Amino acid sequence: MKKNLMLIFGGVSFEHEISLRSAYGIYSSLLKLDKYNVFSVFVDKVTGIWYLLDSVPSSAELIKRHTTSIVNFIPGCGIFVNNKSLEIDVIFPIIHGRTGEDGAIQGFVKMMDIPCVGAGILGSAISINKYFCKVLLKSFNIPVVSFIGFKKDDYILNKEGIKEDINNKLNYPVIVKPSVLGSSIGINVAYNVSQIEKYIEEAFEYDLTVVVEKFIKAREIECAVIGNDQIKIFTPGEIVVQDFIFYDYDAKYSTVPGDSIVFNIPAHLDMKHLLDIKEYAFLTYKYLELRGMARIDFLISKDTNLLYVNEVNTIPGFTDISMFAKMCEHDGLSYESLVDKLITLAFESYKKRKDKIDFTRLES
């Protein structure tokens, strides 16, 4: 008997359009698997309203919003559309960035008591926050590039002091990032003090916390990881960027792989780097309490050959050019099998939690 799966995509997020592309790929795979009844739920970018669609369309222009298809969630009661109950066995969120990748939807689904694909509340919330993620990894002696972080209120009160810290502790050039955002949105490289203020202000347009890191010329390595208690680390891949300073938003989504962007799977690594990447991927996954899946990004300095953990993505892209599925496929796990495996992991994680915790103690 087929399970009822709800695929949630879109979202009130700067990465809304990327989510649509990822959802289309996953939806197509679910149709090929023919193991699930798929309920496609689109979250409007402006209003945040959830709509049940007939399918995941290939482009945003084809999405139709009907008031009769609005999805309502009532914890303890169920999911309803037009006063009709939906029996959902598992939820697959593919909203990138805020509300989808930051623990919000994970907490909501947990309140609904439904298995959910991917990381839980804690792992999602820490991983998406570049500042706290780096602080935590550094505390476990996992190498990260030198950085400082600060909130908008602190910057307003001590602008010159923070700029002085950037100059003294990091030295230029530096890379300026919003703390909670993905897909390289709002990221800029500042080469001198005259640029830093402009880029900090721009980063604050996306988040209330900014991270400034020492900019290094580096090889960009990505590593796919799946699993719960037992994890599998796939062969790392490398993104070779020719015409961009780093792998920014335009390079990721506005450029067709070719002369400017080359994906090497496997990445050309010496044995030490390969083993270190797999070890740090394992430890990062463990310390952040991740489950389901993650893409862990690394940097290898072209000057010093040193390795750093860069960022962690708990809902990596599933578009036709995304590296996550390609790395899994290289090691023999097809796109369709990957999607199916992630759903299985969601059921396993849910069952373990139910078996481990005696919920009868809550009964009066």
UniProtKB/Swiss-Prot annotation:
Pfam families with a match to the protein in the record: Dala_Dala_lig_C, Dala_Dala_lig_N
Keyword Methyltransferase found: no
Residues that hold Mg(2+) 1 according to the record: 297, 311
N-terminal signal peptide: none
Cofactors named for this entry: Mg(2+); Mn(2+)
InterPro entries: ATP-grasp (IPR011761), ATP_grasp_subdomain_1 (IPR013815), D-Ala_lig_Van_CS (IPR000291), D_ala_D_ala (IPR005905), Dala_Dala_lig_C (IPR011095), Dala_Dala_lig_N (IPR011127), PreATP-grasp_dom_sf (IPR016185)
Keywords, in A-Z order: ATP-binding, Cell shape, Cell wall biogenesis/degradation, Cytoplasm, Ligase, Magnesium, Manganese, Metal-binding, Nucleotide-binding, Peptidoglycan synthesis
Gene Ontology terms, MF aspect: ATP binding; D-alanine-D-alanine ligase activity; metal ion binding
Gene3D superfamilies from the UniProt entry: 3.40.50.20, ATP-grasp fold, A domain, ATP-grasp fold, B domain
Chain sites annotated for binding Mg(2+) 2: 311, 313
Compartments where found: Cytoplasm
Biological pathway: Cell wall biogenesis; peptidoglycan biosynthesis
Residues annotated as binding ATP: 167-222
This enzyme's EC code(s): 6.3.2.4
Assigned GO CC terms: cytosol
Coiled-coil intervals, chain numbering: none
Main location: cytoplasm
GO process annotations (BP): cell wall organization; peptidoglycan biosynthetic process; regulation of cell shape
Limits of the ATP-grasp domain: 134-344
Cofactor note: Binds 2 magnesium or manganese ions per subunit.
Family indicated by similarity: Belongs to the D-alanine--D-alanine ligase family.
The protein's role, per its UniProt record: Cell wall formation.
Protein name, as recorded: D-alanine--D-alanine ligase
Gene (name only): ddl
